[in-house]
Amino acid sequence: MEGNKTWITDITLPRFQVGPALEILLCGLFSAFYTLTLLGNGVIFGIICLDCKLHTPMYFFLSHLAIVDISYASNYVPKMLTNLMNQESTISFFPCIMQTFLYLAFAHVECLILVVMSYDRYADICHPLRYNSLMSWRVCTVLAVASWVFSFLLALVPLVLILSLPFCGPHEINHFFCEILSVLKLACADTWLNQVVIFAACVFILVGPLCLVLVSYLRILAAILRIQSGEGRRKAFSTCSSHLCVVGLFFGSAIVTYMAPKSRHPEEQQKVLSLFYSLFNPMLNPLIYSLRNAEVKGALRRALRKERLT
């Protein structure tokens, strides 16, 4: 490399500090979780594409959420499983940086898609007469494309700042994958600016969207309480509670990981929390939506019935 930057070539990822038998068990569990993530989100995406009754803005964005969850998990889980099965857990420097970039980008996309989904529920419940104009297919397409493009552009900012740092060791990160705060500890230079940018990005992409979601749902709650029909109120609560569960899991774990004072959460606890945030959320999202959503369950039953008839 040019200039005074020194680059390490390989990075060592720590192994789980457990015996061989438990390591095999963990490998099996993580493989099962990853398989459930692929199957669950794949089924959600497939049902939404195939069932014309689900061709609505809400399920359009839910299909994007399924794509994000599959991409998010596929970014690091296969490498983590490979490291569990091998004696040496290493990753080259630039693939590690790319893993960090994709980790941030997909997390940003999920934040924005969840905000758009809350706006969709707000428009549907609070402004039903204007819903078709507020959430036309053109608007939905623009919101979806903007969420993806903006998220990847935002993830480029910390990536460029990371690549401007010299990396001369140590060669081991104290994390199970290339998480950005752990990667920064490999730099042999002051990372103050990087940490400030990461915190500012967290405020912008976590706190800001979360406030928008909460405001939307306060308005939604007030509108639901005014609904006269018990069936209509139940359906609205069911749909919104599913979305709130996903929002709580995602934003809650992310804010604790990246914005809570580090003294209150030791590094080992943060590793476990980050693992939960990155491994379990993508698996739980389709379960939450399929178990609590009558329309998704109905579409799944129709698909299974059609399969049996053929």
UniProtKB/Swiss-Prot annotation:
Protein name: Olfactory receptor 2A14
Gene Ontology molecular function: G protein-coupled receptor activity; olfactory receptor activity
Function summary: Odorant receptor.
Alphabetical keyword list: Cell membrane, Disulfide bond, G-protein coupled receptor, Glycoprotein, Membrane, Olfaction, Receptor, Sensory transduction, Transducer, Transmembrane, Transmembrane helix
Membrane topology annotation: Multi-pass membrane protein
Extracellular side: 1-24, 79-99, 158-194, 259-271
Gene Ontology biological process: detection of chemical stimulus involved in sensory perception of smell
Keyword set includes Glycoprotein: yes
Disulphide bonds in the chain: C96-C188
Listed Pfam families: 7tm_4
InterPro entries with a match to the protein in the record: GPCR_Rhodpsn, GPCR_Rhodpsn_7TM, Olfact_rcpt
Residue ranges annotated as Cytoplasmic topological domain: 49-56, 120-138, 219-235, 292-310
Glycan-modified residues: N4
Species assigned in the record: Homo sapiens (Human)
Keyword Ion transport among UniProt keywords: no
Membrane-crossing segments per the record: 25-48, 57-78, 100-119, 139-157, 195-218, 236-258, 272-291
GO CC, alphabetical: plasma membrane
Gene that this sequence comes from: OR2A14
Coiled-coil segments: none
Similarity comment: Belongs to the G-protein coupled receptor 1 family.
Compartments reported by the entry: Cell membrane
